[in-house]
Amino acid sequence: MKLSDFDFDLPTELIAQYPASERDNSDLLIATTPPIKTKFYNIIDYLKEGDLLVFNNSKVIKAKLNLERNITINLNQKLSDDSWSAFAKPARKLNIGDEFYSDNHKVIITEKFAMGEIKVKFELDNISVFEFLDKYGEMPLPVYIRRSKRHGEEEESSDEAISSQNPEIATESKRTPSNDDKLDSLRYQTIYSQIEGSVAAPTAGLHFTKEILDKLKAKGVQIAFVTLHVGAGTFLPVKTENIHEHKIHTEYCSITPETAEIINKAKQERRRIIAVGTTTLRTLESSCNNGVVKAGSFETDIFITPGFKFQTTDMLLTNFHFPKSTLFMLICAFAGFKEMHELYKYAIKEKMRFFSYGDATVLYRKV
């Protein structure tokens, strides 16, 4: 299939710049025929006793570092305790051996590659890399979340952006960069995140509250966790018209023996397995061999396109994705190429909000 097969027209005003007023107050589209539009807090009505919900418990780190000379680096993947791969902008300003300082801490450029990719080494004074990032870094929001002027372009004020995107989130006090940072630190993180390592949020989980999880458990819905540390490569565009020539960056995954046992038992008992997010689905499918999920830690570069044979997942909860993205290709593989194009047309007509801070949809695997 061609890259152009996965294109569709998306009005820019549907790209969510802020989260909904409450996590579970976002819209939810159930991919039935016809589709059902509801609120996320009603997801309980579409799950049943015995269902297994699998979440990604990776925690987003403050992976964006603003350095001297107007250089920004976004960490991508941990290579060792003190070394990370990263993307730099503008990379042309960097040379191997460049050093940047914050107090008694040092960030060193050790390697430089094409497409802005670099390797960095941290020489820190009695703190870990994660502690350093928590103090000096920023939440690594996607580039399509644009709340201030960039490159001389005129944009809406934060208040105007909020009101036009979602009237429910209009605030009494004026938004400021400082307040936005606090908001993102809270809302660009799932409530169940545990293991530090992601440089982008597993966004399908952002809608869940403790109350929803408690109600699901009370209903008899089982919950399990896997880990996939989301890399910056998740935002890289596909540039080849032949989609199979595209290469995905590797990402670290982990499944505990306990979780593998829970998933395999659910499969044996023919209970529904629902992946919360594409990262969870990719972790499950990467670990599955002959229908059995294997425990362990590993790296995956799995690229799921139409024709892929799914072994683990019956339903997928996910946000709305970019045109021509690897994730839109994934949902077309999961729930049907024609069906997803039709569903997205409906979502756009209903003015549902797209991408990281946007609305969610429940998809059913096409048999």
Curated annotation (Swiss-Prot):
<dbReference type="Pfam" id="PF02547">
    <property type="entry name" value="Queuosine_synth"/>
</dbReference>
<feature type="region of interest" description="Disordered">
    <location>
        <begin position="150"/>
        <end position="182"/>
    </location>
</feature>
<dbReference type="InterPro" id="IPR042119">
    <property type="entry name" value="QueA_dom2"/>
</dbReference>
<keyword id="KW-0963">Cytoplasm</keyword>
<comment type="similarity">
    <text>Belongs to the QueA family.</text>
</comment>
<dbReference type="GO" id="GO:0051075">
    <property type="term" value="F:S-adenosylmethionine:tRNA ribosyltransferase-isomerase activity"/>
</dbReference>
<dbReference type="GO" id="GO:0005737">
    <property type="term" value="C:cytoplasm"/>
</dbReference>
<keyword id="KW-0671">Queuosine biosynthesis</keyword>
<comment type="subunit">
    <text>Monomer.</text>
</comment>
<dbReference type="InterPro" id="IPR036100">
    <property type="entry name" value="QueA_sf"/>
</dbReference>
<comment type="pathway">
    <text>tRNA modification; tRNA-queuosine biosynthesis.</text>
</comment>
<dbReference type="InterPro" id="IPR003699">
    <property type="entry name" value="QueA"/>
</dbReference>
<comment type="function">
    <text>Transfers and isomerizes the ribose moiety from AdoMet to the 7-aminomethyl group of 7-deazaguanine (preQ1-tRNA) to give epoxyqueuosine (oQ-tRNA).</text>
</comment>
<dbReference type="GO" id="GO:0008616">
    <property type="term" value="P:queuosine biosynthetic process"/>
</dbReference>
<feature type="compositionally biased region" description="Basic and acidic residues">
    <location>
        <begin position="171"/>
        <end position="182"/>
    </location>
</feature>
<protein>
    <recommendedName>
        <fullName>S-adenosylmethionine:tRNA ribosyltransferase-isomerase</fullName>
        <ecNumber>2.4.99.17</ecNumber>
    </recommendedName>
</protein>
<keyword id="KW-0949">S-adenosyl-L-methionine</keyword>
<keyword id="KW-0808">Transferase</keyword>
<dbReference type="GO" id="GO:0002099">
    <property type="term" value="P:tRNA wobble guanine modification"/>
</dbReference>
<dbReference type="InterPro" id="IPR042118">
    <property type="entry name" value="QueA_dom1"/>
</dbReference>
